């Protein structure tokens, strides 16, 4: 049977939750199912990204952005190390590319002093884009 499994933010919110997701996927795969996995952003990541985008518009110290980006990276890499250490190099590249893109758009928002609906929507999408590992990796880890 072909299945699509969608896991929301709390399902991928922390290390223990992700391990449960992997177990669910493994059980279904071991039962002979073909699986497509869709994951949301980790718990509160989207909210944090939105808050940072809104704050950066009027922020006078861009170092705040660097701190936010470092914290966001640490959270994702720490989770990755605990859940899928064999994929750390590959997935870290995936995360770093997306973080660089996010930082670039946030710098543009800061420089323009404007957060348009279009840029806000684009920024919001990074919560999912930063999900700890590429959904295709769940099957390999499981």
Model-derived segments and spans:
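Nucleotide/pyrophosphate-binding catalytic subdomain
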Residues: 1-142
């Amino acid at each position: 049977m072909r299945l699509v499994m969608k896991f929301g933010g709390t399902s991928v919110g922390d290390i223990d939750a992700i391990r449960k997701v992997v177990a669910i996927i493994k059980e279904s795969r071991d039962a002979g199912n073909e699986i497509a996995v869709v994951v949301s952003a980790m718990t509160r990541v989207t909210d944090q990204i939105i808050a940072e985008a809104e704050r950066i518009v009027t922020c006078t110290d861009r170092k705040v952005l660097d701190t936010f980006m470092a914290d966001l990276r640490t959270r994702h890499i720490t989770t990755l190390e605990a859940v899928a250490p064999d994929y750390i190099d590959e997935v870290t590249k995936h995360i770093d590319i997306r973080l660089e893109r996010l930082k670039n758009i946030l710098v543009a928002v800061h420089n323009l002093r404007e957060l348009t609906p279009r840029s806000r929507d684009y920024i919001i999408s990074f919560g999912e884009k930063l999900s700890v590992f590429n959904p295709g990796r769940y099957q390999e880890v499981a």
